[in-house]
């Protein structure tokens, strides 16, 4: 049986997301999240403009000769610096607190046809390593549904508690959300 890595797309790379990626980001959000959990165009634009260093995309390049013909976004992570030690309804909006040491991840998504190939692990590990080395903050926090907890634990996140703040919002009250965190330690990725 062939391993999933043998079917990885060619010419993959990770780079910071920019405002010119907005259309592809919106498309990916619509494929990865139910309508009530998607970030709006306004919020995504805010994040791309105010904290692009916290927004990473996994792309496939279509190359002809030495020329790049097209870049296709197949995964992304979007975050902001948040004022609390956990995700709140407020922090999921248009909020970036530059002086904060807490980075809130608001979305991790891989295009459906590229799932189950460890690409989310690749993207998230790269994200954690970059933030650790750049000393942008000292902790990453996120909220997750219970089925995703083992995935986040594999890349070093720990369960903190059930998030009761987001449950107060009608868009998020239908399911249980779990607060998770991961320390950013520069020495962890030193060579």
From Swiss-Prot:
Pfam family, one: Acetyltransf_1
Catalytic activity, EC: 2.3.1.-
Superkingdom as given in the UniProt entry: Eukaryota
Keywords tagged on the record: Acyltransferase, Cytoplasm, Transferase
Entry's localization field: Cytoplasm
A GO term from the CC aspect: cytoplasm
Molecular function as annotated in GO: aralkylamine N-acetyltransferase activity; diamine N-acetyltransferase activity
InterPro entries: Acyl_CoA_acyltransferase, GNAT_dom, SNAT-like
Keyword Lipid metabolism applies: no
Note: Present with 8680 molecules/cell in log phase SD medium.
Protein name according to UniProt: Polyamine N-acetyltransferase 1
Annotated source species: Saccharomyces cerevisiae (strain ATCC 204508 / S288c) (Baker's yeast)
Classification of source organism: Eukaryota, Fungi, Dikarya, Ascomycota, Saccharomycotina
